């Protein structure tokens, strides 16, 4: 099913990873063997700890992967615009409620039958969306929240407040189950679109009748600081990427103007006997010189921004960022006769990749 990350300091030191509490990308899934129903049941999570003092709500983080394309394919390809935009101070995201059959959520249910799926939501993040402060709180305060990545065309980051779980890039299928009272903080989204399925797991009638203790949740101050730093870093990266796209659009326009002015000056020189206005030619040449200066300035500024983005983006994420920039440039419309200008001036040979 997955693995559990207890939030006790002694337990956090265990495992094959470095002592750092920040989780890296998930490893490549291993080939699964066929297991019996009993074995499969034993692999499932347990959200209640049975002690001499009674049932205690666990304060652990459960991390696993799910075959989301098989289970939730219709939600991944859904391009409807019925999401509700939440655009507040330090928070921007799109959300809508959805109905998901319980059978598709079996992987996040506990083996003891103490919790059931209640409400489900789709959260969509676009470039620049996310949380710089605060978190998303959904579901029962005495329950758990399952966060499942259905789609990620960009660089998505996630932090479970008060814990050591910080993910710099969530992959499709990644699943994290945590206490609902902690919330989920989606770090600023870089590049393409991401969609998450949020499942609220509430106590069942059986558990409520049995009774259980809700302990105070622990807190990791160092992780809070790390998450804040990572959030600010991602904001800077987004700003530099936006500047890079803007420079690229301005550069295209400058090349276009340069080409048109040069063609006009050539026309004037070709018909020198007819066009005798030397002042006109001087004005055109002056405009050409100004345009060339702008091009040089833009190229220099672009090189600086590329260097900055390279220093901020993880090496394995550069292709994602490059593809996003290329897509944004193509979608911006640009000037007319773009292909002709680009080809004639070899603009496509300029190095805009990170």
From Swiss-Prot:
Pfam families: Pox_F11. Induction: Expressed in the late phase of the viral replicative cycle. The keyword Transit peptide does not apply. InterPro entries: Poxvirus_F11. Keywords: Late protein. Transmembrane segments: none annotated. The keyword Nucleotide-binding does not apply. Stimulates increases in peripheral microtubule dynamics and may increase the motility of the infected cells, contributing to cell-to-cell spread of the virus. Seems to inhibit the signaling via the GTPase RHOA and DIAPH1/mDia. Belongs to the orthopoxvirus OPG055 family. This is Protein OPG055. It comes from Vaccinia virus (strain Copenhagen). The gene is OPG055.
